[in-house]
């Protein structure tokens, strides 16, 4: 059962949010955020001598949510890929020195911002170093390695392998560090991120093994010692009832055995860095949306006020999100497509979904929208973006106001 299923059954609570703040609205559960942070940090602390969590701010940059993570685990850092994400980290109370900055095809202005803020700069290519040296050099640097393979729940979120635009091929990675050494840099990290949404523990074993074998090769050839090794993120969550969540305790125990086979002196071993996003925030958030129309055509369509402008993942990746009727689930089911109000036929939140009978005005919940939900929402058809609400047991507060049409045109 979904961890927030009981909340979705509370029709009084969610109707109250909808009546006060309108629909569609993103709703996040504070307790679930804290549970996810604790589950990850506890598994790491039991198995690794030194580790650092950099929350992937791209997944959801709302500072109110990041502050909950920061309060739960004060040492948390940020995985940033733009100046805006550095700003979000600072706004949330995270010092940029605890953040890793990984751009790709970076502009000089982006590099200047990351450098001036004191982020741990992770470069995507050897040419990035050429751009960086024109504006300044940090004391420590890392490079993103592409190990030649990747994996993800959808092809569009595989970030390693021969088709990926990211990282330096493993066969060229030594030269990147050699170039950095020639510029006088003496402190180094190594980073790799191969894909997102993975639920197979063996995949992470394969990734870490590839990173470690290359780390040893680089260290021996160049006579350097890595201060940290980041295996990125990519830890998936179950988006469907038949999917099984990652067992962090078991997985990090297995990964630590591989890690300390390579670095047997735990005290001097590089710190393990992670860059999780979905595994912290995805299942904490859902969208409440109101049924606006019912159509019997060649198919049965349920029109709702949340569309691809609200949640882009189904249209972009073919992603599937669980949906529930708010309140009493009911027994009668029909097969329907859920569609928004956008003038594109790809505007489907769900397709051929068996669902309880609905009436106009009913509320539905679109689950697991906490990651890459609001952060990927947009204004197509000049639709204002949703409000965001933080739920703390039976109380709630608005943490982002609903955008207005006037807001959209305020910079024109």
Set out the residue ranges of the language-model regions:
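A charged N-terminal "starter" segment
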Residues: 1-120, 126-139, 180-182, 186, ...
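Conserved, mostly hydrophobic/aromatic
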Residues: 33, 58, 82, 114, ...
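Active-site-proximal loop/turn and secondary-structure-junction residues that shape catalytic pockets
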Residues: 57-61, 84-85, 105-107, 125-127, ...
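Short acidic, glycine/serine/threonine-rich loops at helix termini
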Residues: 65-67, 90-92, 111-113, 133-135, ...
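Conserved beta-strand positions
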Residues: 80, 101, 123, 192, ...
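Glycine-rich, aromatic-flanked loop segments that form ligand/cofactor-binding clefts
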Residues: 138-150
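Active-site loop/helix belt of alpha/beta enzymes
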Residues: 147-292, 383
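Charged (often Lys/Glu-rich) extended helix/loop segments that serve as interaction or gating elements
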Residues: 260, 267-412
